UniProtKB/Swiss-Prot annotation:
Chain's role: Catalyzes the ATP- as well as the pyrophosphate-dependent phosphorylation of a specific serine residue in HPr, a phosphocarrier protein of the phosphoenolpyruvate-dependent sugar phosphotransferase system (PTS). HprK/P also catalyzes the pyrophosphate-producing, inorganic phosphate-dependent dephosphorylation (phosphorolysis) of seryl-phosphorylated HPr (P-Ser-HPr).
Residues annotated as transmembrane: none
Family, similarity comment: Belongs to the HPrK/P family.
Annotated HAMAP family: HPr_kinase (MF_01249)
Region (Important for the catalytic mechanism of both phosphorylation and dephosphorylation): 198-207
Species this protein is from: Clostridium perfringens (strain 13 / Type A)
Subunit structure: Homohexamer.
Gene Ontology molecular-function annotations: ATP binding; magnesium ion binding; phosphorelay sensor kinase activity; protein serine/threonine kinase activity; protein serine/threonine/tyrosine kinase activity
Protein name: HPr kinase/phosphorylase
């Protein structure tokens, strides 16, 4: 999903020096500092990127003679450039303005330091253009681990989230989870309308931050584990050792999935806490509980064989 120049101007409070064509889309999240291009090197040039002139490029132009500066800028603007942004509030060279006007291109200016501006705009564009989807579920932060709780309606996802909030964990979103894939990570957040709200059957919608404080909610969280609730089946084939890993694909990213059978009497919130703690343990340890049991069994068998 692209971003228009007008949207960029509004979100970054950019000063408009030269107005270009309306509704020009920005379709890539990378930016380019055209130092090499101003020196005359255009191999591998990406004109579709936002072009950013900072102190270094500005000083390079400043040291040129007016005729050379005009020549280099006319060449630069002969490409199909979406917009040019000058940082640090630097003065605009007259040759640059004239060349931009010929092509009806956007020239914008920011007071921010170049490196900080590039970092912010790259993150902004990556977020805006990231592939996204919406899933039904509840996203919570448990011990710093983003856990997406899924399952059919009425199975107890929201009630479990409420219990987790009472135990000091944090809610990201209930019912609808907006997910974006950014650099291989899945970032989940709440739709703006339902942010901070939790629907509990029999009670209705509650404002989590009002009842439990602002520390009980989060704007977004990276999804690490999927906890899928399903009704208990006596003949169900459930993983009892934790050796059969299951994954679910979301936007091309595989996420570990745990199936949790639900029946009266099970403390699901405690199980989810244990799953989060176990995830952290597995990330930090080279040995699993199953490996420990196998080692103990071998040691026990060796002792018995010596008797």
């Amino acid at each position: 999903m692209g971003v228009t120049i007008e949207k960029l101007i509004k979100d970054f409070s950019l000063e408009v020096i030269q107005i270009g064509e309306e509704n020009v889309p920005i379709n890539v999240s990378d930016v380019n500092r055209p130092g090499l291009q101003l020196a005359g090197f255009y191999n591998y040039f990406a004109p579709e990127r936002i072009q950013v002139i900072g102190k270094a490029e500005w000083s390079f132009l400043e040291d040129m003679s007016p005729d050379l500066r005009k020549k280099r800028l006319n060449k630069f603007f002969s490409f199909d450039i979406s917009c040019l942004i000058i940082t640090r509030g630097l003065e605009i060279h007259e040759e640059l303005l004239k060349a931009a006007r010929k092509r009806n291109l956007w020239i914008l200016r920011s007071d921010m330091v170049t490196t900080k501006f590039i970092s912010k705009i790259t993150m902004y564009l990556s977020d805006k253009m990231a592939p996204e989807t919406r899933l039904h579920g509840v996203l919570v932060d448990v011990y710093g681990i983003g856990m997406l709780i899924t399952g059919e309606s009425g199975i107890g996802k929201s009630e479990t989230a409420l219990e987790l909030i009472k135990r000091g964990h944090r809610l990201v979103t209930d019912d609808a989870v907006d997910i974006k894939e950014i650099d291989g990570d899945l970032i989940g957040r709440s739709p703006e309308i339902t942010f901070g709200m939790l629907e509990v059957r029999g009670m209705g919608i509650i404002d989590v931050s009002a009842l439990y404080g602002l520390s009980s909610i989060l704007n977004s969280k990276q999804i690490k584990i999927i906890i899928h609730f399903e009704h208990w089946k006596d003949d169900g084939d459930y993983d009892r050792l934790g050796v059969n890993d299951e994954y679910q694909d979301i936007l091309g990213v595989k996420v570990k999935k745990l199936r949790v059978p639900i029946r009266p009497g099970r403390n699901i919130a405690v199980i989810i806490e244990a799953a989060a703690a176990n995830y952290r343990y597995q990330r930090m340890s080279d040995i699993s509980p199953v490996d420990i049991i196998e080692k103990r069994m071998l040691e026990s068998m060796e002792k018995e064989s010596k008797i």
